[in-house]
């Protein structure tokens, strides 16, 4: 009987139940646990494990460069960031409203950290999330276009519930390359949100993409439904270096 139960659990793709049912049945017997409670605990263990595996899969597929949470963000070092507004984003209501989130500001002040934190929360809630830099995005689409696979590659960036585009503006894009980015923005417009980080102001986007008309078209779609954060302050890395140098002087 035990072998058959084990076999049936695997055939039904219930590996946790296959592994734990015998021990849990013995525990239920010795602790006077009802049949329904026993079954509930088995099913609960299976669901918890499935959810954990699902989240790990989503993290792997997201291409996030590292894991960050909002709890590790130093709001005291970045007073320009409204913690209340950031934590409101963690409710993920922006997903239902199809609102984009834009983090603007100089390098090293936590834009990517904040974007990844929101992405991690989306993954924890079961939403497909994808991370890529603006430069890598256009390069991948250009290569796919040359290989006759543009539509297939576009779906990689259009399909996820949340798309994080990092480092917009760190490297200039030629107009042809920028057009690929525009296609992604246009296809996600009013369908699914983009979280974007940039070290450039909106007024500089024409220079970034080499085409002011194209830049205006991008911004028109990004900003129509959006939440914007303008971060200011000293770079974390420069701040740590300065504090370290000051500490060494005091010694």
Swiss-Prot record:
Pfam families (alphabetical): IstB_IS21
SUPFAM superfamilies on file: P-loop containing nucleoside triphosphate hydrolases
Keywords associated with the record: ATP-binding, Nucleotide-binding, Transposable element
GO biological process: DNA replication
InterPro entries attached to this UniProt entry: AAA+_ATPase (IPR003593), ClpA/B (IPR001270), DNAC/IstB-like (IPR028350), IstB (IPR047661), IstB_ATP-bd (IPR002611), P-loop_NTPase (IPR027417)
One MF annotation (Gene Ontology) recorded for this entry: ATP hydrolysis activity
Binding site for ATP: 105-112
Entry-linked Gene3D superfamilies: P-loop containing nucleotide triphosphate hydrolases
Keyword Repeat listed: no
PANTHER family per record: ATP-BINDING PROTEIN RV3427C IN INSERTION SEQUENCE-RELATED, CHROMOSOMAL REPLICATION INITIATOR PROTEIN DNAA
Family: Belongs to the IS21/IS1162 putative ATP-binding protein family.
Protein name: Insertion sequence IS5376 putative ATP-binding protein
């Amino acid at each position: 009987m035990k072998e058959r139960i084990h076999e049936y659990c695997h055939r039904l793709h219930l590996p946790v139940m296959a592994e734990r049912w015998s021990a849990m049945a013995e525990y239920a017997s010795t602790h006077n646990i009802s049949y329904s409670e026993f079954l509930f605990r088995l099913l609960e263990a299976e669901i918890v494990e499935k959810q954990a595996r699902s989240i790990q899969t989503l993290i792997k597929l997201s291409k996030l460069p590292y894991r960050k949470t909002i709890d590790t963000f130093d709001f005291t070092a970045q007073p320009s960031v409204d913690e209340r507004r950031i934590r409101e984003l963690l409710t993920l209501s922006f997903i239902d409203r199809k609102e984009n989130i834009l983090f603007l500001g100089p390098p090293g002040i936590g834009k990517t950290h904040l974007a990844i934190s929101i992405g991690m929360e989306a993954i924890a809630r079961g939403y497909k999330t994808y991370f890529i830099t603006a430069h890598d995005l256009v390069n991948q689409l250009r290569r796919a276009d040359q290989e006759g696979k543009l539509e297939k590659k576009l779906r990689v960036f259009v399909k996820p519930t949340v798309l994080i585009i990092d480092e917009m503006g760190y490297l200039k894009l030629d107009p042809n390359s920028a057009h690929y980015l525009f296609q992604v923005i246009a296809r996600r417009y009013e369908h699914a949100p983009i979280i974007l980080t940039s070290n450039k102001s909106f007024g500089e986007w024409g220079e970034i993409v080499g085409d002011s008309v194209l830049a205006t078209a991008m911004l028109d779609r990004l900003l129509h439904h959006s939440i914007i954060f303008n971060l200011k302050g000293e770079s974390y890395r420069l701040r740590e270096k300065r504090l370290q140098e000051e500490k060494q002087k005091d010694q």
